[in-house]
């Protein structure tokens, strides 16, 4: 247990500390020289720290504006979104977290050795999504085995979804050999992919392509990321009831984020490149040409201007949905600052088409409101159990746009707290059918298309 205490201490330090350590170990395992391994690990660590600083700056600018917008719009709902950090704290504070972490690591390694996944995740921090599912199952059933199985099942789903989403990462974000095994980044794809397929077949509609290049072409300097950040920031400021000076200040902050994020992403890729190249050489030799994918935090995707633009435009859209959706009690708040993570893969799916990304994200987020409302009592009780009760506003319940608010994690949770003899075979049967369809029908076509 002493070893796990050390591990948990590193985890508590956050991904900025964890990532360079994991990257260094990863580089050494792939026989990169110690000097190059240290250089790559520190470069990746510095880039990730830079990304986090800019994202935190974005969140601190957007958070007060969002709160003011809620007040200005007169929205009154009794379930508040406390953000992914609160839900992550519940997951990492579970009494059975050592067993769940081992199960997630073991599942990843077993699937790799059995050639059932190509994703090798170094993004240990985002285990918290699976840990949260397992924790909620444990609190509901008081059964350690079932809870650990729920976490492992969530991990299996994530690793396979990361495999299937990897062409989007390599093609749109130009990050070959990388994927994103984070369920909050992948979650909207099961809803967005079939709807996007339908959109491709609607005459006229399928010709609308409103992307960053279109903005630059038709709007000149006003289509540049800096100006888009300024305009969107000022617009959000006015919707929040800010005076012109405050609104302009918010606009400057959004413009700064739009400019700095791509630079940090470029530095991240620069640090990762030697490891990716060495990993490719080793895996080509040891695994007979298998392409092992490095699973990273979705922060590496946030350097794309279309992602930030889509995320900023989704803020008032989600607040509007909170008001008009019948039966909803969830008020989006803290996780609005994390929207870039949640929209990034949809933006890649549409190849940067902001118009289509907004429609797909709007549709995909609708279930979140109902699931967040339904699971709020459970999330509130779990937060109180692990000692987070003081953070809950008086007279309110808490939820988030992560945890069991996401459709797949909600389904896994319900399966493992239900009649296991019925629910688990149904879940696995459906999943393996999807697995077969994706591996035999979809992915070969994607690989053929990408090779042309």
Feature map (PLM): residue ranges:
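Hydrophobic transmembrane alpha-helix bundles
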Residues: 57-61, 75-76, 94-95, 161-163, ...
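Membrane helical hairpin/interfacial module
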Residues: 40, 47-98
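Hydrophobic alpha-helical transmembrane segments in multi-pass integral membrane proteins
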Residues: 56-63, 139-142, 297-299, 371-386
């Amino acid at each position: 247990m002493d070893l796990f205490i050390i591990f948990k201490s590193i985890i508590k330090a956050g991904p900025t500390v964890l990532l360079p350590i994991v990257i260094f170990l990863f580089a050494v395992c792939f026989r990169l020289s110690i000097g190059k391994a240290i250089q790559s690990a520190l470069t990746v660590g510095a880039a990730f720290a830079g990304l986090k600083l800019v994202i935190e700056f974005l969140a601190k600018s957007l958070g007060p504006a969002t709160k003011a917008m809620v007040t200005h719009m007169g929205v009154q709902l009794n379930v508040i979104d406390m953000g992914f950090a609160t839900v992550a704290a519940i997951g990492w504070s579970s009494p059975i977290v050592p067993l769940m972490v081992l199960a997630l690591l073991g599942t990843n390694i077993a699937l790799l050795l059995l050639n059932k996944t190509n994703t090798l995740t170094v993004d240990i921090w985002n285990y918290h999504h699976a840990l949260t599912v397992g924790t909620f199952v444990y609190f509901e059933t008081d059964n350690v085995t079932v809870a650990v199985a729920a976490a492992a099942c969530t991990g299996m789903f994530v690793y396979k979804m990361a495999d299937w989403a990897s062409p989007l990462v390599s093609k749109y974000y130009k990050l070959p050999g990388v994927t994103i095994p984070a369920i909050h980044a992948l979650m909207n794809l099961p809803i967005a992919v079939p709807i996007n397929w339908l959109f491709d077949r609607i005459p006229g509609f399928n010709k609308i392509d409103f992307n960053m290049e279109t903005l630059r072409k038709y709007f000149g300097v006003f289509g540049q990321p800096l100006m888009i950040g300024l305009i969107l920031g000022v617009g959000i400021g006015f919707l929040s009831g800010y005076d012109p000076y405050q609104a302009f200040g918010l606009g400057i902050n959004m413009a700064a984020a739009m400019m700095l994020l791509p630079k940090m992403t470029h530095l991240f890729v620069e640090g990762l490149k030697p490891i990716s190249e060495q990993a490719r050489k080793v895996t080509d030799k040891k695994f007979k040409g298998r392409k092992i994918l490095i699973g990273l935090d979705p922060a590496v995707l946030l350097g794309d201007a279309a992602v930030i633009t889509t995320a900023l435009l989704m803020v008032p859209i989600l607040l509007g949905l909170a008001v008009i959706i019948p039966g909803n009690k969830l008020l989006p708040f803290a996780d609005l600052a994390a929207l870039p993570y949640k929209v990034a893969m949809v933006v890649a799916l549409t190849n940067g088409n902001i118009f289509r990304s907004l429609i797909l994200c709007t549709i995909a987020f609708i279930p979140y409101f109902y699931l967040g409302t339904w699971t709020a009592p459970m999330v509130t009780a779990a937060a109180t159990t692990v000692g987070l009760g003081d953070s809950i506003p008086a007279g309110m319940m808490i939820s988030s746009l992560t945890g069991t608010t996401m459709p797949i994690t909600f389904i896994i949770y319900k399966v493992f707290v239900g009649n296991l003899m019925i629910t688990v075979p149904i879940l696995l049967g459906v999943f393996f059918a999807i697995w077969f369809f994706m591996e035999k029908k979809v992915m070969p076509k994607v690989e053929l298309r990408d090779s042309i």
